[in-house]
């Protein structure tokens, strides 16, 4: 299994709706609301790098309310 941590910036007021939708998305293992520079921390897990990339591109970055993301691949 491949894993990634994604930091997400959202449009103001979209936090609850985004968290709820992401928590029910296949491949997204955890969603945490943050205070500070980023709004959410999202843990993504997939069978391989391509699966992780697809989850991030298709299910996370394309969501309404998502302004920007920073992705960090987990090595161990």
Residue ranges of each PLM-predicted region?
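A compositional/biophysical signature of low hydrophobicity enriched in polar/charged and small residues
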Residues: 1-76
């Amino acid at each position: 299994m491949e894993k990634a941590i994604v930091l997400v910036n959202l449009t103001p007021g979209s936090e609850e709706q985004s968290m709820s939708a992401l928590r029910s998305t296949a491949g997204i293992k955890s969603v945490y609301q943050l205070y500070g520079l980023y709004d959410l921390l999202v843990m993504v897990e997939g069978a391989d790098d391509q699966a992780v990339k697809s989850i991030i591109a298709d299910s996370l970055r394309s969501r309404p309310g998502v302004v920007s993301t920073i992705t960090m691949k987990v090595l161990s």
